[in-house]
Amino acid sequence: MIDEKIQLGQEQQQAIDLILQFLKSKDTCFSLVGAAGTGKSLTISMLLPQLDCNYQLCAPTHKAALVMRNYCDNDAITLHSMLSLSPKLDITEFDVLNLGFYMTKKPQQIPTKGLVICDEASMINDDLFDLIVERVKSYNSKILFVSDKAQLLPVQSTKYSKVYTHCDQTFTLTKIYRQSSENCILPILNDLRKAE
């Protein structure tokens, strides 16, 4: 739960303002990007009370959904659950390196004319990105991807997720709050992050 006395930084407030404008636009996809410690989680948790639409919180993994559930004090589910996807487990054709999925039913967890907020989006591969956007559009909803470009790439991929290149709008948080500016390691961490 977020303390009501917390003050957002200028960038964080700007991100919220842009997301709220995005919700009124014809665009479907917004990407909020930021390094660890820039306040992505805080920004999302402070955005939620300002939303005047239904929303669904999700993430690619159970662990990420649990973390999101804790910092937003709200239910979060996996992307696959939201999309009603189950793994294809035909034992005669099972290939651990090439797992497929099938839709078990029409997705029930995507809000109509609402917002899907997906954390840890750097892990989303091209096919899953396309499916998410297609499904969200079919419900006349919008998607907000939240990610850190220095986090995990999509599984079996050597390139960044489409969340960095195919969203209608993108905003990047740059100011790091979690580390003290006097921390002697911070410049080294920033150099490593920029090295890509």
PLM regions and their residue ranges:
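Conserved ATP-binding/catalytic motifs of P-loop helicase motor domains
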Residues: 1-196
